[in-house]
Amino acid sequence: MGKYFGTDGFRGKAGVDLTAEHAFQVGRFLGWYYSRKHAEDSARIVIGKDTRRSSYMFENALAAGITSSGADAYLLHVTTTPCVSYITRTENFDCGVMISASHNPFYDNGIKLMNGVGEKMDDALQAELEAFIDGDPAYLPWATEGKVGKTIDFYSGRNRYIGYLTSLPSRSFEKHKVGLDCANGSSWMIGRAVFDALGAKTYVINDQPDGVNINTDCGSTHIEGLQLYVREHHLDVGFAFDGDADRCLAVDERGQVLNGDKIMYICAKHFKERGQLPSNTLVTTIMSNFGLYKALDKAGIRYEKTAVGDRYVYENMKENDFMIGGEQSGHIIFRKYAHTGDGLITALMLMQVMIDTQLPLSVLAAGVTMYPQVLKNVRVDDKDLTLADAAVQAAVEECTAELGDSGRVLLRKSGTEPVLRVMAEAGTAEECEKQVDHIIAAMEKSGHLIEVKK
């Protein structure tokens, strides 16, 4: 991870950690970098944004930087991250840029970069961009006269994405009552358009963005509102998206939440039964629930475990030609249809399973039972030394042996905070607490523990 760009782009508090000047510099660099590859025409860079007030500021700054370096900036305006990915790869853009901080509060924002096929930008290019931001910007030439780039409204790209989504399901959603929680974010128009076009009776909440209400007590991080709405309106299913709609969680007809693990299980099992799961493998991260692996074993489905982050899930899928992978949080990638997590595609795939099987979501999810989980964040004097400590390693081994096939423990470094994450899954919450506390006690005895964070 670099100074500015992490696993999910350049993110921070708007106007503090991420400023309009940063956005302008990103645009300047991208415009210059891709213009070098075009001798006869202009480089083309497509930009999307979510509904945060600061997204409009960053959109203008990016476009100014891009055009000042001689490239053309195409503006999708408010749209989803997966829409930018789709349009980048299908409309032959040099790269795509999404302005969003995903599920974060409105006062944060971010810049996500994608390569010409809609994948996350490679680390080497982002490192070069960081060096430019911290270096002397004067060495890049300014475009002049007829070389100055154009800024082009590209609403039609968003409409093409909607058309693509509506082409994916093989059956109508007629007679299905579907609730959508759009988190006052990027999906607020697209979600309704897609489900209405597919014949669903669509009920939409949190589709009134005002620039500051994105993710506020709504969407996939506050799904309780959708749970209540599904029960009160007797809906068949509900889907909750985050601010840029690259993740999706579901609510069944009883108002119960299905996280990413349950959604992946349902889809993988259905596709396997239809001979549509290449290599019979699902890609997960190390944070997926122990219950998912138990259910996959029973269903005869193999699985891979990657580091936390949809970037690592996608890399594994691409390298091994796997088709379904994702995270418990609802970042799920269907690689046949997208090169990034797409909340709307996830919702469409789950609808397809419901319609194919003619079963309610509660029945489809019954095959997997989530194990209780306890996770504690622990500040230590040195993360690496603590992980290597013999007493701590012995405690982990003792917990693993005691749980056997009925649970697991996991000790890992946080990628974003100065803490270690201690997690246990077992048959009861009490058993989880016992195992986690045993590992923390070993840290304390070895002199590494500073505090257990609340």
Model-derived segments and spans:
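An N-terminal, well-structured beta->alpha segment
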Residues: 1-64, 68-69, 148-178
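Short glycine-centered, acidic/aromatic-flanked micro-motifs in structured strand/loop junctions
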Residues: 48-50, 180-182, 252, 336, ...
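Proline/glycine-rich low-complexity loops and linkers
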Residues: 127-162, 167, 253-325, 333-334
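Phosphate-binding and adjacent anionic-ligand microenvironments
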Residues: 237, 274-454
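General beta-strand structural signal in soluble alpha/beta enzymes
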Residues: 5-6, 47, 73-78, 98-99, ...
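Buried hydrophobic positions in well-ordered alpha/beta secondary-structure cores of metabolic enzymes
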Residues: 8, 47, 84, 97, ...
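N-terminal small/polar loop signature for handling phosphorylated ligands or for N-terminal nucleophile
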Residues: 44-108, 193-251
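Gly/Ser/Thr-enriched, mixed-charge loops and adjacent short helices
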Residues: 13, 109-233
